[in-house]
Regions:
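Metal-cofactor-dependent catalytic cores
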Residues: 1-231
Length: 231
């Protein structure tokens, strides 16, 4: 299991976590806001975000920059990115994101915007918890796809429309397959290189869909090693 305290930054691998309506506790609970545009930044616009790590310390976010500096200071974060930003917590208000219309030519492409849900910085209100099967990943690094849960034992696409119950009683309503974008082609620490062929392959062979998104029907604690069984 993984959670990503600051949107579009590196996250942390977990053994056990509380799950509630907004998703895994602390997941995508903070983000950087561009003070000039008012938009919530992602690695679609700022690939550099993937080289920082979001940390939760006493309920507040801290960003570990590529040089090891840990900060929540707006001036320091702005200097790093070369734009005026502030670190903000999720609220009930929807965040606005942007994406290039053409992933092959981002510099020359128009950018479109959309609103995500409130209470956490998820891209879609239909996916508060993201799930990917090991078989679906092939040889791709799991970190390219930034899932919350990696499962074994079969094809996850067939679970759309069903409910999954964990051994501990958490119930997830699987609502949709997850549409992929240029994020999965971005470079990341640890030798993950920029690779548009990953996105091209997912677009060509899977109609741009990889992984499934779920809503939380019954909250509780979820741990690695538990089964998720259709009910």
């Amino acid at each position: 299991m993984w959670r990503y305290p600051v949107k579009s930054m590196q996250g942390e691998q977990l053994e056990s976590i509380e799950v509630a309506a907004a998703g895994l506790s602390g997941d995508r609970s903070w983000a950087l806001r561009d003070l000039e545009t008012g938009l919530t930044l992602t690695a679609r616009r700022c690939p550099e975000l993937l080289f920082a790590r979001g940390l939760l310390i006493d309920g507040s976010a801290v960003v570990r920059l590529p040089d090891g500096t840990e900060t929540a200071d707006s001036a320091t974060l702005s200097s790093w990115l070369g734009r005026d930003v502030e670190l903000v917590a999720a609220s009930e208000e929807a965040a606005t994101y942007e994406i290039a219309a053409d992933a092959e030519d981002e510099a020359g492409s128009p950018w479109r915007t959309w609103n995500g849900p409130g209470h956490a910085f998820h891209d879609s209100g239909r996916a508060r918890v993201s799930i990917i099967g090991e078989n679906t990943l092939r040889a791709w690094p799991v970190r390219r796809f930034r899932p919350n849960i990696v499962v074994t034992g079969g094809e996850e696409d067939s679970l759309v429309g069903s409910s999954l119950r964990s051994d501990g009683g958490v119930v997830l309503d699987v609502s949709a397959q997850i549409q992929r974008c240029v994020m999965i082609s971005r470079p990341q620490p640890g030798g993950i290189e920029r690779d548009l062929d990953v996105l091209r392959t997912v677009n060509r062979e899977r109609a741009a869909l990889l992984g499934i998104g779920a809503l939380v029907a019954t909250a509780g604690r979820l741990s690695v090693g538990e089964s998720l069984v259709p009910v």
